[in-house]
């Protein structure tokens, strides 16, 4: 007799190395808790519908719980010859409780079983990711709240642009993460759907109650089409996309952390707890955690591309190709959860070198736009003002000083309307004070932005 659940039709058994290639138990045992949760709901419903006896259902449920307990105590060894988590659990269940265990699969296929597992798993992981994003956002708000008056240079093309508040800069990542959080939240509507009861693809002749299992498993809704229920992997692609985009945002933030921590910038100092050294250069303190996060975005994006390619040519309904949906998702989930935790700790423990930042904006030309705006207040067209300031900057570069160092007489050679108040006008802190448009870097606008962010976090 074959040890395969499907072995009755076959005359020759696969060799061990073929079993190993076909099996998914090495990675889909990640789904053991979801598989048992789904099976308990299915067994409960079968008994309530009179399809199996209450006694058999109770035996099945107790057997499943004992398997779950023993697995987490490392007391169960699963077999590749049994292919996957579903058949390994069923085999162990029958071994423990006898023929009653063979009734569990009544009215169910591995097709809807694995889909149920994956929906339950993805829902839980997305909820965890949302919580981790919110936690990181909270740390960002705390840092920003303490640095509203800290001034730093902003950049375009990695060239100094304009002075801005450090709080305003770091809050940019709050809003990126807010959109990420919203995408994950919205995706739950498409994840939180029950496929159980679709069976292989066409439903079942048994009088099952899919609404009951939907309630037992706390799903928000159920699939209206059994074929769609076992064919759908959109929610996995969507989750991989949302993970990848969030990782892109973390990667951008990590790149800035790396730059800020260089000797050339010295804007921040990373904690030793989130840095490493060199095996040959004793002086080194490397931002390895930030670099790893920056690098891991390629990994999660690769999983997204892989899943898109897996599905692109699949006919309905289930195909073995779909086994490839798991490892990429599991790894992407592990990657983003780890990255979010590391990022939170890394920025929570970093030191912001406020004096260095405040001094930096006095040693560049990031206040050049302010000089042009000053000339505009003297009724000079902006394009003309731009030309005048460009010439002043060029002269400063040639003579080795900055706009705050230019003598008033020199300014007036370029335009007679420039008065002594120009020096106060060009001070970085005053540059920020004049930025009062909604969402700008001015202190009052940043404080307003922080109030909105705190309100969002409290919801």
Swiss-Prot record:
GO terms for molecular function: argininosuccinate lyase activity. Belongs to the lyase 1 family. Argininosuccinate lyase subfamily. Keywords: Amino-acid biosynthesis, Arginine biosynthesis, Cytoplasm, Lyase. PROSITE patterns: FUMARATE_LYASES. SUPFAM superfamilies: L-aspartase-like. Its main location: cytoplasm. It catalyses: 2-(N(omega)-L-arginino)succinate = fumarate + L-arginine. It comes from the Bacteria. One of its GO terms (biological process) is arginine biosynthetic process via ornithine. The gene is argH. Disulfide bonds: none annotated. Its EC number is 4.3.2.1. It is an enzyme of class 4 (lyase). Pathway: Amino-acid biosynthesis; L-arginine biosynthesis; L-arginine from L-ornithine and carbamoyl phosphate: step 3/3. GO terms for cellular component: cytosol. It is found in: Cytoplasm. HAMAP family: Arg_succ_lyase. InterPro entries: Arg_succ_lyase_C, Argininosuccinate_lyase, Fumarase/histidase_N, Fumarate_lyase_CS, Fumarate_lyase_fam, Fumarate_lyase_N, L-Aspartase-like. The keyword Amino-acid biosynthesis applies. This is Argininosuccinate lyase. It comes from Staphylococcus aureus (strain USA300 / TCH1516).
């Amino acid at each position: 007799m074959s040890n395969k659940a499907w072995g009755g039709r076959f005359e020759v058994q696969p060799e061990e190395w073929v079993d190993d290639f076909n099996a998914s138990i090495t990675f889909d045992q990640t789904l053991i808790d979801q598989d048992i949760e789904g099976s308990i709901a299915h067994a409960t419903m079968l008994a309530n519908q009179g399809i199996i006896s209450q006694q058999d259902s109770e035996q099945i449920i107790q057997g499943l719980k004992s398997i779950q307990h023993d697995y987490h105590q490392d007391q169960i060894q699963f077999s590749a010859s049994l292919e996957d988590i579903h058949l390994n659990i069923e085999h162990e269940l029958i071994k423990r409780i006898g023929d009653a265990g063979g009734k569990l699969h009544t009215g169910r296929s591995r097709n809807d079983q694995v889909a149920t597992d994956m929906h339950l798993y993805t829902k839980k992981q997305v909820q965890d990711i949302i919580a981790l994003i919110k936690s990181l956002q909270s740390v960002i708000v705390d840092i920003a709240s303490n640095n509203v008056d800290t001034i730093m240079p902003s950049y375009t093309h990695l060239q100094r642009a304009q002075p801005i508040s450090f709080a305003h800069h770091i809050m940019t990542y709050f809003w990126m993460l807010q959109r990420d959080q919203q995408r994950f939240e919205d995706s739950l509507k498409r994840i939180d759907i029950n496929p159980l009861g679709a069976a292989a693809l066409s439903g079942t002749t048994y009088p099952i109650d899919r609404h009951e299992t939907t309630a037992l498993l706390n799903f928000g809704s159920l699939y209206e089409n059994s074929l769609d229920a076992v064919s759908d992997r959109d929610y996995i692609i969507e989750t991989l996309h949302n993970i990848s985009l969030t990782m892109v945002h973390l990667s951008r933030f990590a790149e800035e952390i790396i730059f800020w921590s260089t000797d050339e910038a010295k804007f921040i100092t990373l904690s030793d707890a989130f840095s490493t050294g060199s095996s040959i250069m004793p002086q080194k303190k490397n931002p390895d955690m930030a670099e790893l996060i920056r690098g891991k975005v390629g990994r999660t994006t690769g999983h997204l591309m892989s899943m898109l390619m897996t599905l692109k040519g699949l006919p309905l309904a289930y195909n073995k190709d779909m086994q490839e949906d798991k490892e990429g998702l599991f790894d992407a989930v592990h990657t983003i959860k780890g990255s979010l935790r590391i990022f939170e700790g890394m920025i929570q423990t970093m030191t912001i070198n406020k004096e260095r930042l405040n001094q930096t904006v006095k040693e560049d030309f990031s206040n050049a736009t302010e000089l042009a705006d000053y000339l505009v207040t003297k009724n000079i067209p902006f394009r003309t003002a731009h030309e005048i300031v460009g010439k002043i900057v060029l002269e400063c570069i040639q003579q080795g000083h900055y706009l705050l160092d230019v003598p008033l007489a020199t300014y007036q050679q370029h335009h007679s309307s420039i008065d002594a108040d120009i020096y106060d006008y060009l001070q970085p802190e005053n540059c920020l004070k004049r930025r009062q448009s909604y969402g700008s870097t001015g202190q009052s606008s940043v404080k307003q932005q922080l109030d909105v962010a705190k309100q969002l976090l409290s919801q």
